[in-house]
């Protein structure tokens, strides 16, 4: 076995790995990035970047990765609920103009990130599969990795004081270091619509149909991605899924969008992705850090995953910078920094993680009390002002305040209760007042377990 050295080994040249590698290389660290497959990836998620994620890219210095890929700037969302719809625009910037998100093909974006990575000083990128983590004689310290590749007949060892695992949502190294079980809540079915007839051009479309929530956003000048919720942990055969889209989803979406979705079922490949939730874990292993989706995942309904990953990359690079950790063999110092990093990241990760699951629960109501909350949420947005700007700042990754999230959530709850009590005949008002307690309880059961999960992890 041959040995090659670096200051830091990064496993995975995806969203987090590329951003982190670029940030560390610019600090003067000698970085080796190992990626199993350097060809353009093809996924149905990770195609919408919120304004907060763009801000994180700017801090790292690689914001130009969104350019030259036919990405489409978005100004917010249009939410469709029954026969009505409500506009949820991104807020204005302090110095003028408005914040924007951007939609793109995931693979094109990753290839741009890899270009930024490979052009960064002090960074080496190697195509190889990491099969094993090396440990020292005590078994307590990770000292490097063992890889295989098409270019080498025998395994190759790479050693470094610090190994950072960024191998994504299907991480093969996670299980040995994280005790939390991964929750699979449901699935997204993905299709690409060609030249759809947008109702609100330049905005993401959130369709709260009777069947399931659907999210649609542009990913090129001629294409839009639609993600359709399919409940349950297991999927039926593909023909059943196509029938579900054609017979249940198409009739329950805005009429202008129906032809393009119907055509996509016949012309595009219907793909699926499990929606997973994993609370974060403090890194306590000497010589190794888990970061990105390998450590923390949230529901993709709100499109906040990449925003969390880019903020993680930026923040982690600061916590292990040469000024913060001069000696990468000083494991106690690194572990202390990891504890600080874990709690510092709570601002943005708490908000995006909890909001993702809260909105998913609200927009897939299982009973009439949850339906009242869903309706209350839409009516809350319709009030305008801070009732719409506050939530979109949270969703867009621009507001990192957990208290603001909890405040808006319970404001939605109380407004939904208010609407519910007044919507029935006067004779039933006493009954509805009693039922309002059940609505409040349902709302609390939605959000409190995830708040506790975030704060205890």
Swiss-Prot record:
Sections of the chain in a coiled coil: none
Disruption phenotype: Leads to the accumulation of squalene.
Keyword Membrane among record annotations: yes
Location within or outside the cell: Microsome membrane; Endoplasmic reticulum membrane; Vacuole membrane
Pfam family membership, one: SE
Binding site for FAD: 15-16, 35-36, 43, 114, 130, 293, 306
Chain ranges passing through the membrane: 347-364, 409-429, 433-453
Molecular-function annotations in GO: flavin adenine dinucleotide binding; squalene monooxygenase activity
Keywords, in A-Z order: Endoplasmic reticulum, FAD, Flavoprotein, Membrane, Microsome, Oxidoreductase, Transmembrane, Transmembrane helix, Vacuole
The protein's Enzyme Commission number: 1.14.14.17
Domain of life: Eukaryota
Pathway annotation: Terpene metabolism; lanosterol biosynthesis; lanosterol from farnesyl diphosphate: step 2/3; Steroid metabolism; ergosterol biosynthesis
Activity regulation: Activity is blocked by the allylamine class antifungal terbinafine.
Main location: membrane
Induction: Expression is anaerobically up-regulated via the sterol regulatory element binding protein sre1. Expression is reduced in cells deleted for the translation-related genes tif302, rpl2501, and rpl31, rps2402, rps2801, rps1002, rps1601, rps1802, rps1901, and rpl1602; or the transcription-related genes spt7, spt20 and elp2.
Keyword Membrane: yes
Site (Important for enzyme activity): 77
Cofactor(s) the protein requires to work: FAD
A GO CC term attached to the entry: cytoplasm
Catalytic activity as recorded in UniProt: squalene + reduced [NADPH--hemoprotein reductase] + O2 = (S)-2,3-epoxysqualene + oxidized [NADPH--hemoprotein reductase] + H2O + H(+)
GO biological process per UniProt: ergosterol biosynthetic process
Membrane topology: Multi-pass membrane protein
Entry similarity comment: Belongs to the squalene monooxygenase family.
Miscellaneous comment as given in the Swiss-Prot or TrEMBL entry: In Aspergillus, the biosynthesis pathway of the sterol precursors leading to the prevalent sterol ergosterol differs from yeast. The ringsystem of lanosterol in S.cerevisiae is firstly demethylised in three enzymatic steps leading to the intermediate zymosterol and secondly a methyl group is added to zymosterol by the sterol 24-C-methyltransferase to form fecosterol. In Aspergillus, lanosterol is firstly transmethylated by the sterol 24-C-methyltransferase leading to the intermediate eburicol and secondly demethylated in three steps to form fecosterol.
Classification via PANTHER family: SQUALENE MONOOXYGENASE (PTHR10835:SF0)
Protein name, entry field: Squalene epoxidase erg1
Native source organism of the sequence: Schizosaccharomyces pombe (strain 972 / ATCC 24843) (Fission yeast)
